Structures are given as C-alpha cells and as structure tokens.
C-alpha cells in the first residue's frame, strides 16, 4: 500500500540514540531497515535531527553538581537533564549510517537553541517558538 499524499516523519535516528551512543535506546538500530522499506511508500519523507550546541541547557554537565536524569526548572517548565548527546557536527549527531538519507525530502534540525530543549519537530518545549530552520 502506498500513501502518495502523506508524509513519513522519521524522528532522530541518530548514532547517539542507537547502541553504543551517549543516550542509547536498546535495539534502536533494529528499526532502520523497516524505516528504509517504508520510505518508498510515502509521498514525502521528513527526517528530524537532534542538533545541540555544546553549551545546551539540557545537558547535565552544563549544570554544576547535577546528575543526568535529574529535573531542573527552566523558564518554560521542568526540564530533564540529559547526558551530553547529539552535539552539532559530532559523530553522535550523525544519522545512523544505514538510514537512507537520500530518500529524505526535508531534514528538520531541532534543539539547536542553547536555552531551550525541543522534543517536537514542530515546536520548541516552550510551545511558542515554531521551527525557524528547516
């Protein structure tokens, strides 16, 4: 079945979220082949890419005395502090090497503002700042 008027949105299939990465998801690399297979079924393919500056406010090591997975209050609400991951231009921020990047019609980078995290391809965590760079 094909979906010519629909988009496949592929979220953060990056080295740091795969086994061996800084914020690895067990078996995260096992989804790459099925994603590649699905790409041909959709009219558009969008990839998102976590893309943090080194001084990102969500990194635990940027908060003296804080541990990964602890909570801090930010201007936009509670924020989980993460291990350093997906730093701009690092191997961890690269897409998984087997992901078919050539099939992407659009790549959306998120989390690139140092003072605010972003879990969405559409809005920053403050729900007020939309995507400025695609």
What are these regions (language model features)?
Residues 17-18, 114:
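Catalytic P-loop NTPase motifs of RecA-like helicase/translocase cores
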Residues 8-9, 47:
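Residue-level marker for buried hydrophobic side chains located in beta-strands
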Residues 18-23, 33, 37:
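Active-site neighborhood of HAD-like aspartate-dependent phosphohydrolases
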Residues 11-16:
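Short polar catalytic/cofactor-binding loops
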Residues 19-28, 121-125:
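Short glycine-enriched, charge-decorated loop/helix-capping segments at active-site entrances
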Residues 2-8:
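Extreme N-terminal starter segment of soluble prokaryotic enzymes
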Residues 33-131:
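Active-site alpha/beta core segments
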């Amino acid at each position: 079945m094909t979906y010519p008027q629909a988009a496949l949105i592929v979220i953060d299939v990056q080295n740091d979220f795969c086994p061996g990465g800084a914020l690895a998801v067990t078996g995260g690399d096992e989804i790459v082949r099925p994603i590649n297979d699905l790409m041909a079924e959709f009219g558009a393919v969008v990839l998102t890419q976590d893309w943090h500056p080194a001084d990102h406010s969500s990194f635990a090591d940027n908060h003296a005395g804080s541990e990964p997975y602890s909570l801090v209050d930010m201007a936009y609400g509670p924020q989980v502090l993460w291990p350093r991951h997906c730093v701009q231009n690092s191997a961890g921020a690269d897409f998984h090497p087997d992901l078919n990047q050539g099939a992407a019609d659009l790549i959306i980078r998120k989390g690139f503002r140092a003072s605010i995290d972003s879990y969405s391809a559409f809005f920053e965590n403050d729900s007020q700042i939309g995507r400025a760079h695609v």
